[in-house]
């Protein structure tokens, strides 16, 4: 997880101010590194209040902020989404996941994009994937079970999604 994602996660967890010193100690970085990460988050649309002798406080975020740090800071999983690859635009998250699998990626790889230029749906049909309207993703799994059980994976995944604790402001990513 990137330092930006870690800082964002900590700011979300605390409902009060988090001192710059606490962030430095927690992540083993300098005050300058924290300040730069906070600056990047602000540029991405997060409203972070900085008060001298108090620290930083996440006040709000723009509704359309979806990036790798944001998604990583919300994942509360041990292996799903680790690693996470985020792209502003990609041909297809599925194609990228297949390439990563061929190169030995671990089960749980999550490929996420704001836009797909060659997205595919069921039976290889074209999938409209315009930027700014949704988050598109492929979760790569390498299940350790008999192929006869594969059809049950859809049901299991549907149940897992229904129990998830990951919710974003516009319910675009579950």
Region locations from a protein language model:
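N-terminal lobe of the biotin/lipoate ligase/transferase fold
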Residues: 2-159
